[in-house]
Amino acid sequence: RQIFTQYINYEITPTVAVGRNVTLPDGNGASWLAEGIKVLRINVPFQAPEPIHPIKSILIKRFNLTYGPHSNAYGPDASSDALSAELALPFGFPLRVISTTNEITIVDEKNNKPITTVNGVKSPAETELNVVSTDQTEGTIYLTLNPSSMSLPEQSDEARREFEMFQKEFTFTKEDIKLFNGSSRSLSETPVGTVLLNGIKFSVESGLLGLQGLNQYPTLILGVDVVGGTRANINLNVNTSIYNPSNVNLGVGDTTLLMVYEIVVGSVTIPNMRLNIGNNTLQAMSKFNPNAGPQGLDMLNRYISGLDTHLNISGYEDSTHIASLKPAFSAVRVNTTLPGLKTKLVQSASLKVLESTGITDDVAQTQVSLDNPFTSVSYTHLRAHET
């Protein structure tokens, strides 16, 4: 098995050719020569005639990246049930890979620096390999990466910056291509039995589809409800829709963004944010301060009047408690629209002029019908002007 693995990896295996016997062309032995042959020892370096590179490519269809409550800020869990690798071997016999353990180091091709290593655990695999000739077997291995921790290549400020930049590039690019270096430990079924191929090396380009700054598709505010407040803020529940255009399911914990209407007028927090691939409907909590400035009051008046208001949702330094995500999250800028209130607060109003109105005083009788679409708002009094 070791010789087979080293052969595939284009490594030299020191072997010794040992003389055993001599047979002449007529089939008879030559005892006088055999004794000399038996003591013959020849060192023979055993190596493939050229590099094989058995793993030709890795395709990531779907990936999961999760920061749990106790995760290392630079060591999230990675997993996938949709990985595949194209394999080609210079052997003409059937092979079926039944499980793999993969260690993958993601490398930035621009500076050739390692970014992070995925220390894979043993995971099942399925194989579609075909013997295409007497000296060629090729096909696809479908891999599963069970939850495995990522780790930095070294504990240094430079290594942490590389990982931060990797996540920032993923956040803002359409496709993030990197070099995937590593080794695979494969348990394979062959005509001669089950064989463990230990340490099959590979180096291929692969990548992830990026988040594109979450601006590829509109971020929608689907509904707003007042659920409480203080002297400083009105507390809102916000129903929102965010589209994830990448091929990565993300779990990034509590996330807070600023609500900007020319000035900062509040904040929006998405607890335990998970962005799955495609469209996500999320519940957020917002603290809105209408007294932040004239813009805050204008925004409130527009909302109550049924007018849409264009806002910007912006990241900042404290958008996340996860240190490695701070550079990416603080640069997020997402445009959205707060739809105006669809329900008219004043449903109807009537004025009755009394016999004394305008004679003894200016008092008239009014009746107003109000609607309250908010969960935690109670009307205590109404002040109005009639013209």
What role is predicted for each listed range?
Residues 1, 117-156, 262-295:
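Intrinsically disordered, low-complexity Pro/Gly/Ser/Thr-rich segments with frequent PxxP/GP/PP motifs
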Residues 29-52, 195-213, 325-343:
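Short beta-strand elements
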Residues 92, 106, 248, 257-261:
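Extended serine/threonine-enriched, polar tracts that run as long, contiguous segments within proteins
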Residues 380-387:
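Conserved small/polar residues in nucleotide/adenosyl-binding loops
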